[in-house]
Every structure is written in C-alpha cells, then in structure tokens.
C-alpha cells in the first residue's frame, strides 16, 4: 500500500534530500576557503562565501564551570555554540577547548577550531558571571 503524498514520512524524506543537496552543493565550489583567524563576539556573523550565502554565526557560550564562591563536584567546561548557514539550511555545532574542531561539506574541506592560545574569561561569582564570552577561532584548509 502506498503512502499518501502528504504523509509525514514522505515530507521528512523530501526535507532530508533537500538538506543533503544544499550541503553537498558546497562541494562543487571550486575554491577553498582561506586559512584565517577570527575573533568574534556573541551573535556576530561571518560571511564566508557570499556567492553561496555561506555564513558562520557565533551564538554564545554555555559555561558550566564552578563559580569562585561555590563548591562543585565536577569542574565543568565552557562550550561555544555556532550556526553554519548555507542558503536556507542551518547546521548547529559546538566547539569546546581541548576537543577536535568541526568540519562540514559546506566548508569546502576546511576545519574550524578554537585557537589553542585562547583562554575563556574567568567564571566569576554565582551572581556575576562574565558579561560576554568572546571567542577566537581558526579556520584551516585540509
């Protein structure tokens, strides 16, 4: 028995094919993205490839480190949230200090990672965490 045209499974399948086509279309781009270092503030975007509407947005940070005036069972960490956009397709990812970077077909073989010399701002007290979490990242062609 065939499923109706508007069935949820069929719509999900069509959406998945469109997503894959959008991300893989970046593979056809002839030029690599340049190696570069960027310093970004929260909610700041970079336009990486205007002809493809490829951008990277630093959304913000999640800080689970122990505040200075608290006792914690585990040390926690800072994780930086990003969104890669190509045309109308979005892909969210996280970068964490000391962990591998991020790659995607949309990045044309490039890798995004936190700069090794970058230190997160101090966590501060419970009531007064850092006002903002700037980030320094590197993009490397592979």
Regions from the PLM with identified roles:
Residues 2-15:
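Bacterial N-terminal signal peptides that target proteins for export
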Residues 49, 53, 66-75, 123-129:
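Short, solvent-exposed beta-strand/turn "edge" segments of beta-rich domains on protein surfaces
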Residues 28-30:
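Bacterial signal peptide processing site
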Residues 95-118:
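Short Fe-S-cluster ligation motifs
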């Amino acid at each position: 028995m065939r499923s109706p045209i508007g069935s949820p499974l069929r719509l999900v399948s069509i959406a998945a094919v469109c997503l894959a086509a959008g991300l893989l279309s970046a593979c056809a781009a002839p030029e690599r993205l340049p190696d570069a270092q960027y310093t970004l503030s929260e909610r700041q975007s970079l336009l990486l490839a205007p002809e493809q509407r490829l951008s990277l947005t630093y959304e913000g940070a999640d800080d689970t480190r122990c505040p200075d005036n608290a006792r914690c069972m585990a040390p926690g960490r800072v994780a930086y949230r990003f969104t890669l956009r190509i045309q109308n397709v979005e892909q969210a990812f996280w970068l964490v200090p000391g962990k591998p970077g991020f790659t995607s077909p949309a990045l044309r073989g490039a890798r995004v990672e936190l700069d090794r010399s970058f230190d997160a701002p101090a966590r501060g007290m419970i009531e007064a965490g850092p006002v903002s979490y700037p980030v320094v990242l590197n993009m490397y062609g592979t």
